[in-house]
Amino acid sequence: MKTRKKKRALAVSPLALVLPATSANLGPAFDAAALAFGLFLKVQAVAANEFSITASGRDPEICGRVENHLILTTYREVLQAEGKAAQPLVLHIENDIPIGKGCGSSAAARLAGIALAVHFGRLRWTDSRIVGEASRREHHPDNAAACWMGGLAVARMSGESEAQVACIIPKGKWPLLLAVPEEALPTEQARRVLPKEYSRADAVTNVQNSMLLLAAFVQGRRDLLVSALEDRMHQPYRAALCPLLPALQKLAGASGVLGAVLSGAGPSVLIFLDANAKDGNGKGGKAGVDRAAAKVRGHLRACGLRAELISTAITNRGAGQGKSWAKRRS
């Protein structure tokens, strides 16, 4: 008589995630849109007997602690809600996203935790549910949608944990410069300065500019961006908290700078450079963009303002399109 062999539980394979930074609001598209750009939170996870983390890059003292870690907290909470035990993990984190500076660091961390829970907990979650859960935890869907899907994300909440999302691949080249001040700005503080009511004129202007902004990205119309970035709903009220913004907005339409907006609620500022800018010898391409970036650096020095300037660009690949995640879904 043959005896049945017990099936061994299949070990869950390691997972690697690459989550881009995101910039929400983009001037007039307040609480409605976000853009993914090329700074990344990279997470490698392997099943283990106990939790441990190694971290490199920006803010390793925050990214490398196990206690109160946003990725691990989210991971545990999602699995607990699903009635599953949290498999201990060894994480290696490589972080390039400024933390607490309006660049979507919390959305990236929460999405990482959710993705780890889905993978190691063997949850059958769709992209929509992953983005919805991250949006519920973030209290708005723009950063989460752009981080997971890439490109330009237009999003709204349609329930407590349901997000309606449309993603657009911007046409053409969109070089960016990110100005990051030394001090962080809590989102709660940036929210407190906003008015409770707006005039019809201001609301209409923002709707018009949001439509122009969308058209600029869809059609690759850089010429529309200078006027399309005007906002009347949040940036005028936050300018006192983010002195980089009014200084950099003065460059809009000149010196190869298309415009500047708060990244999220600030204090970082996202600067759109003209991909067709020319250098002093009439050369375009990288030379022209580099000259525009140098103009920004010189302007900040002349204004007596200090900030780290990071050259980057829009990225159309979100965490949900990464090789490791795509492989596990195939």
Regions from the PLM with identified roles:
Residues 39, 103-126, 148-150:
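DPxDG-like acidic metal-binding loop motif
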Residues 18-20, 36, 94, 147-150, ...:
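Short beta-strand segments
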Residues 180-240:
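Active-site rim beta-loop-alpha module in soluble metabolic enzymes
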Residues 217-330:
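Glycine-rich, charge-dense phosphate/pyrophosphate-binding loop(s)
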Residues 7-11, 25, 34-37, 83-85, ...:
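Solvent-exposed alpha-helices and their adjacent loops that cap or buttress functional pockets
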Residues 2-101, 119, 123-125, 314-330:
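ATP-binding N-lobe of GHMP and related small-molecule kinases
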Residues 125-174, 240, 260, 266, ...:
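Alpha/beta catalytic cores of group-transfer enzymes, especially the acyltransferase/condensing modules
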